[in-house]
Curated annotation (Swiss-Prot):
This is NAD(P)H-flavin reductase. It comes from Escherichia coli (strain K12). Keywords: FAD, Flavoprotein, FMN, Ion transport, Iron, Iron transport, NAD, NADP, Oxidoreductase, Transport. Residues 2-99 form the FAD-binding FR-type domain. The keyword NADP applies.
Length: 233
């Protein structure tokens, strides 16, 4: 693990509660797609955030931070970023990084800002094998929570093997994507998951339900199921 001081070079409010933050570390860094960093608030308080950028992007790290009055944990980090324009991070962390089996079909599952985890893996996987069979399921309460959907749709035009499945719980009139939960959408679309590598970014309870359902009902291999939550459940 490396501790780095980072300059905050840009902060973009993507939605009312989600910020795209770019930081530039003061020294060389490395990580694997799908790993996360820890923002050091003090010696005993370190807070995890997935890196949305890829390991090949050497000049900066991109974070997607969902900060609101109901998520004071992340809001405190954003308050520091906006006040000090610099942060200290520990990097890298996590074992749910992209594996090298480039021919296996892949499923990425993310809710909300969990997309940052999926984005790093997706872009890295496409760089390695532009024709890989990849399906990304991105869920949110409302359409606005799928804040980078246009980027994904543009990628799908360039990569015929990429399928983008947006899912919202509370659709507005005119919504053309799926309705409900991402896990239900995966189960509806796949009779078997035995040959897939599956990467999941979500709450512990969602990850546990996914593991139980995918393995028992769709023959997913537990050793090909990846997510930071699985280190704790």
């Amino acid at each position: 693990m490396t501790t780095l001081s980072c300059k905050v070079t840009s902060v973009e409010a993507i939605t009312d509660t989600v910020y795209r933050v770019r930081i530039v570390p003061d020294a060389a860094f490395s990580f694997r797609a799908g790993q996360y960093l820890m923002v050091v608030m003090d010696e005993r308080d370190k807070r995890p955030f997935s890196m949305a950028s890829t390991p090949d992007e050497k000049g900066f790290i991109e974070l997607h931070i969902g900060a609101s009055e109901i998520n004071l944990y992340a809001k405190a980090v954003m308050d520091r970023i906006l006040k000090d324009h610099q942060i200290v991070v520990d990097i890298p962390h996590g074992e749910a990084w992209l594996r090298d089996d480039e021919e296996r079909p892949m499923i990425l599952i993310a809710g909300g800002t969990g997309f940052s985890y999926a984005r790093s893996i997706l872009l890295t996987a496409l760089a390695r094998n532009p024709n890989r069979d990849i399906t990304i399921y991105w869920g949110g309460r409302e359409e606005q929570h799928l804040y980078d959907l246009c980027e994904l749709e543009a990628l799908s035009l360039k990569h015929p093997g990429l399928q983008v499945v947006p899912v919202v719980e509370q659709p507005e009139a005119g919504w053309r994507g799926r309705t409900g939960t991402v896990l239900t959408a995966v189960l509806q679309d796949h009779g078997t998951l035995a040959e897939h590598d599956i990467y999941i970014a979500g709450r512990f309870e969602m990850a546990k339900i996914a593991r139980d359902l995918f393995c028992s009902e769709r023959n997913a291999r537990e050793d090909r199921l990846f997510g930071d939550a699985f280190a704790f459940i």
